[in-house]
């Protein structure tokens, strides 16, 4: 019974897929290999499971430890920022909350102003300077001269510890800058006047952000104009006059030093991103220099585009407070992102800590390598033991191997009778006997070569058929009836046997399969049961090769006084129903359908055209670049309503060797 699908028959691809799932008999060919494979597989599974579990534990522990360290790192950074913020904002708030000398612009009550700010700077070494901006444009600034940049900018005399800058007006109302230099004890020992540089505190971001407000605000980070250091400003309006703004510059060197010093691994990095994802502080000194070089005073930094990690985090921000794996190039990083909210400085920014996963897992990987080495040694020992054990029980295996080789040659005369106390060998013996019986059954109704190809392709599975594109070739001997009438049956059989031997050799050499010998006719087919992408070409080449061989055959016939066998060929390509049909006890592998009928009709049409090899347009369409054809027009084959394009096969475009002619079965 044909197995039907939506198109009527099972598709050839589905048949091949189902047969691909069947276990290969090569597993039964070597007990030694099978025994060794089973033992090795068991040991590998057990060892891999144990090593894998140990590695997973070590990996999880390493990642968990890294996450804890990252959280602790972020906590310490927040504490440092909190200390800087608290210390600075406390000084600014103190000055802004008391109705004191800062309510009047310089030069009034200069000593009181200097005393307060000098004391504040002395207590806060991270403060670069403290200043006051007035609504009139007056400005008062106390600078710590521990900074070499400030000493150079102000040309400070030796022994100066504090510089006091003030913007005042002379008697004519013209602005000028006064700079006072104080020693470490607070005594003034030098004074210098300079023309005003046009600085107006009222235009500065720190003044505009705090004026008329109540709470302290933070500005930056930015590169300080004089020192070039990374800094921020905390400013607040004076409570006595909200148009007077007190500001303090905070140097963030302690933060940058902390980031560069506190590293989880050699290549781990940490950096701070602003609200729009631009880096402002980085633990890597090279990256920090690029960041500093790309920004100006009071202006945020531009992102260095060549840093893949920063760009990846900007494009796909990881969730805050949760460690995430981030792929950058061919390296994976464990990344933690935490918002900075508890401190005034850098509030609204994010700190990012990233460590290469391979460095975090270095210890776990070392443990894995050690485990694999031990497991490998165990496997090697087990393989040796398995080989020794298999050698003791493989006496019968060689006999089974010989029997398998005989089956491969379709030798069914020698029985397979191997006895063994090993269950696997006994099972294999039974399986081979069943295989022998199955192949022998096939040999009852199809030639051995067809059986061999059918078994190799997996198409012999009982009564089944499917649609398959094939190239069919039919042949017939001209005037064979007359030849038979003039010869004895023995002579006819002898001539036909030699003739069919010739056909079998040439068809097999061109990857074809002889489906049937019917009288003096031959029905051969390509692309079934073995797939052949060049089936049409191979069929044409086969017909030409048979004609060439027949010349020698007929010469021998003439020399022996026997008749020549003039053979006609018909070749057609198309879809046919291919499979095994018949009764349960007698199956026949064949092809049916219009394709087969057309090939048979083409063979007969040679008489009308005076040709020997005719092919259809479907054949020409597939191999016109490899085979030479002569068009003969169109004609209707018997039993068909539509006309066919008829061509004579006259030769090949180029000669090919046997390998080019097709793939051996």
Curated annotation (Swiss-Prot):
Keyword Membrane among record annotations: yes
Alphabetical keyword list: ATP-binding, cAMP biosynthesis, Cell membrane, Lyase, Magnesium, Membrane, Metal-binding, Nucleotide-binding, Transmembrane, Transmembrane helix
Gene3D superfamilies per the UniProt record, alphabetical: 6.10.340.10, Nucleotide cyclase, PAS domain
Record-annotated HAMP domain positions: 394-444
Entry EC no(s): 4.6.1.1
Subcellular location as annotated: Cell membrane
Cofactor detail note: Binds 1 Mg(2+) ion per subunit.
Described purpose of this protein according to its UniProt entry: Plays essential roles in regulation of cellular metabolism by catalyzing the synthesis of a second messenger, cAMP.
Family: Belongs to the adenylyl cyclase class-3 family.
Name assigned to this protein: Adenylate cyclase 1
Protein's organism: Rhizobium meliloti (strain 1021)
Gene this chain is encoded by: cya1
